[in-house]
């Protein structure tokens, strides 16, 4: 019998509990993320693309750690790319609209810092079902991580109510997390 999948809330509680002590963990946890239309994350040409799993590229797992410098009740997290020194951040575009940017940054350095790093932070908010959540920008609170309805398009930011998809499945796929000795 296959073990029952954890809810997003359970996954996040485990994450925040494990990373309570900033010196306890030596690497982020890996999560599989896919939108409610079954599009998974792929890193291609320096962009994070949402596409069906049968895509020709390898699925990009997301490195995740909590941001303990913001209000923990809102479940702030940093999202990076597993096995890469790249992290998602929200910045203003030349049109003064928030945009999603992937920057070179060590997610564990952000985690260990005492700075808030709101531009790098997303609030993981249960929406939809117990198995889905949305990721709200901490720097731009009305903006959410999103995918296009069309496959093979880059992830971005949008406001709630837009025609884009803001609900994601979020599943920890890390092997036993390592504690520093």
What is each residue range found by the language model?
Residues 1-181:
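Lectin-like carbohydrate-binding module/patch detector with strong preference for beta-trefoil
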